[in-house]
Design a protein with these regions (language model features):
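Surface-exposed, charge/polar-rich loops and edge strands
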Residues: 1-194
Length: 194
């Protein structure tokens, strides 16, 4: 499809629906709540949900002691797709588009510890790898247990559905599926929300 105007044109507003994960019943009253405080520019097909926990006030407080580096994520609808094959090498990973500015690349390169907020951020940073540079592109990296992380040191994320690529990425980050299950059980027993 070719458009004769930008997707950001206000004329498209009446046709836009906020994409919600399959486990949330679609309700337009949720559209405002299901958006990060830093959602800009338009283009993402889904919210980077780990970022939903960050308010402007919390980000301001974090900025007082840590450096926050921003990148643009265009989360794809494939983020909700389950893995439908037992042979992971046959799974076709969804593609997500991103942009890393030169300022962000400099901050990342100067950092001794990178904490990613969300699995899409992990995929982007692991695709770009150190040394980072200004870059706009896409990633279809599929991170599964056994993957050796090269860019990201810690991860803030949500709970993920069984058989999802996101859960596999978290298992890889933790180190094993068994340890991920143990941590999920602990989190559920303690009433953690993410």
């Amino acid at each position: 499809i070719r458009l004769d105007r930008s997707i950001e044109d206000k004329g498209f507003d009446k046709y836009r629906l906020t994409p919600l994960p399959p486990y949330i019943k679609h309700d337009e009253s949720l559209a405002e709540e299901y958006q990060t405080v830093y959602a800009d520019p338009l283009g993402s097909k889904a919210a980077p949900t780990a970022g939903l926990h960050f308010t402007s006030e919390l980000l301001s407080r974090i900025n007082q002691t840590h450096t926050v580096a921003e990148l643009t994520l265009h989360v794809g609808m494939g983020t909700f797709a389950p893995v439908k094959t037992d042979d992971l090498s046959k799974h076709i990973m969804h593609e997500e588009h991103f942009s890393v500015s030169s300022d962000t690349a400099k901050l990342l390169n100067a950092s001794s510890h990178i904490t990613a907020v969300g699995t899409t951020t992990v995929r982007v940073l692991e695709s770009a790898q150190k040394p980072f540079a200004s870059f706009t592109g896409s990633t279809s990296i599929f991170i599964t247990p056994g993957y050796q992380f090269k860019a990201v040191d810690s991860l803030i994320t949500n709970f993920h559905l069984p058989k999802s690529t996101l859960l596999m990425l978290v298992s890889a980050f933790i180190g094993s599926v068994e340890e991920m299950h143990r941590l999920y059980r602990h989190a559920i027993n303690e009433g953690y929300r993410f």
